[in-house]
């Protein structure tokens, strides 16, 4: 796979970050592989330790056992839990063999504090609330 910072630079909210800054933010990111059915985050479980990004494959975002979104490469998850320190409101489960990157909490907060990051959080939260009928 290409360098993580090059991959991320194609997707919001990373696409608005200067290349050198993005490279520094992701230098300590961990890459994880998952088999179909593996859970990464558990609804009402431990808070997210950072910002997750799907690199390959796809992940199901579930609320109360129902799939409300399929996360594809370039999409983030765990940000509401990471930002609040609260338990995740959703379970995230590998739909197929998948790979994800985990950015540290500090790096995730820095990414999401940009104008593009704030817009990304608002957009994803609105979409998820609509899909769960909580608007």
Name the predicted role of every residue range.
Residues 4, 20-22, 82, 87-89, ...:
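A small-molecule sensor/coupling module
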Residues 30, 50, 85-91, 97-99:
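Helix-loop-beta junctions that constitute the ligand-sensing/allosteric loops
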Residues 55, 65, 84-86, 94:
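Short loop/turn positions at the edges of beta-strands in beta-sheet-rich folds
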Residues 66-80:
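Short acidic-glycine-tyrosine-enriched beta hairpin
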Residues 97-108:
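A short hydrophobic beta-strand segment most commonly corresponding to one strand
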């Amino acid at each position: 796979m290409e360098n993580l910072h090059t991959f991320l630079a194609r997707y919001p909210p990373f696409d608005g970050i200067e290349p050198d800054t993005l490279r520094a933010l992701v230098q300590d990111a961990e890459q994880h592989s998952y088999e179909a059915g593996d859970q990464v985050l558990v609804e009402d479980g431990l808070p997210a330790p950072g910002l997750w990004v799907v690199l390959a494959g796809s992940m199901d975002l579930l609320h109360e056992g129902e799939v409300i979104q399929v996360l594809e490469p370039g999409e983030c998850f765990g940000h509401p839990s990471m930002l609040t320190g609260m338990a995740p409101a959703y379970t995230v489960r590998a739909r197929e063999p998948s790979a994800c990157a985990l950015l540290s909490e500090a790096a995730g907060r820095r990414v999401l504090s940009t104008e593009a990051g704030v817009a990304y959080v608002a957009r994803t939260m609105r979409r998820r609330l609509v899909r769960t009928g909580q608007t």
